[in-house]
């Protein structure tokens, strides 16, 4: 898959956008369904996070599409420590549905 949905600091205009900008690709506005948290927990405690849920509220963000992503997943997975990379269906503002990866908060530990 050559697409990543971002909703936090990796979005254009935010503190870590340069990470994806350096990979090179195309940005499309879109949304997923889930619960957005301004601050996560565990290793992600100081950063925004999401827990996906098909009946959850709409969480807006950006779909980053790049053929170069395959060469960068290991680096991105390490950067997103505290999150799990899972598959999601993103709806673009034009109504198109696109399969992509997203970094979701890891389950809370008991």
Task: Show the residue positions of the predicted features.
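Glycine-aromatic micro-motifs
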Residues: 1-110
